[in-house]
Swiss-Prot record:
This is Der GTPase-activating protein YihI. Disulfide bonds: none annotated. The keyword Repeat does not apply. The keyword Flavoprotein does not apply. Belongs to the YihI family. It comes from Haemophilus influenzae (strain ATCC 51907 / DSM 11121 / KW20 / Rd). Residues 42-77 are annotated as: Disordered. GO terms for biological process: ribosome biogenesis. Residues 62-77 have a biased composition (Basic and acidic residues). Keywords: GTPase activation, Ribosome biogenesis.
């Protein structure tokens, strides 16, 4: 059995020596000399610092292991070494949660009625469908619905603008043709 050095334990029964008290060296009196107890405490602290000056025993072998442990701790970062593919172009910036969809409110820009009427009259699809109807061909329900909606909108716009759709008689057409100067179109 190894020998153990006896130490003096300070208990409530024993009186406290001044040497056993911890003295803060920083609290030393400014401008005055240190007492012998303070000098002893300071010397003991300095001796402890000098005693543990060197490296720990076996540090030559354990230093390599510590470096390896440090490297392993650094690699634990999940962002480093990830095999997950990262898209270069962000497709969806804000993904709403399931069931929480904000309905998009369509703001219809109100056009000038004259411009809208002009667009409807120059609509190629509408003109082709009207030509097909005039030729006696049958068109699908969706096409017929489109034609009806466009014609209704045209009549609304004409009423709003105060334009009356007059069916010109053949005599009126003949008179306008006679009055025209053909040289204007050359």
């Amino acid at each position: 059995m190894a020998r153990k050095k006896k130490t003096r334990r300070i208990t409530d029964i024993m009186p406290i020596r001044k040497a056993d008290k911890k003295i803060d060296i920083t609290k030393a009196r400014s401008g005055k000399k240190l007492t012998c107890y303070e000098l002893d405490a300071k010397a003991r602290e300095d001796k402890k610092k000098r005693k543990h000056k060197g490296l720990a025993s076996g540090s030559r072998h354990s230093a390599v292991e510590e470096k390896a442990n440090k490297l392993q701790n650094e690699i634990k970062d999940p962002k480093i070494g990830s095999k997950k593919k990262i898209p270069l172009v962000v497709e969806f910036v804000n993904k709403p949660e399931k069931g929480q969809v904000i309905p998009v409110i369509k703001q219809v820009k109100k056009q000038d009625p004259m411009k809208e009427l002009e667009n409807l009259e120059n609509n190629e699809i509408l003109n082709e469908l009207l030509d097909a109807l005039d030729a006696g061909k049958t068109i699908s329900k969706s096409d017929q619905q489109f034609v009806d909606e466009c014609l209704d909108r045209i009549s609304e716009l004409m009423e709003e603008l105060g334009i009356e759709d007059e069916d010109e008689s053949e005599d009126d057409l003949y008179r306008t043709f006679e009055r025209m100067d053909i040289n204007q179109f050359r």
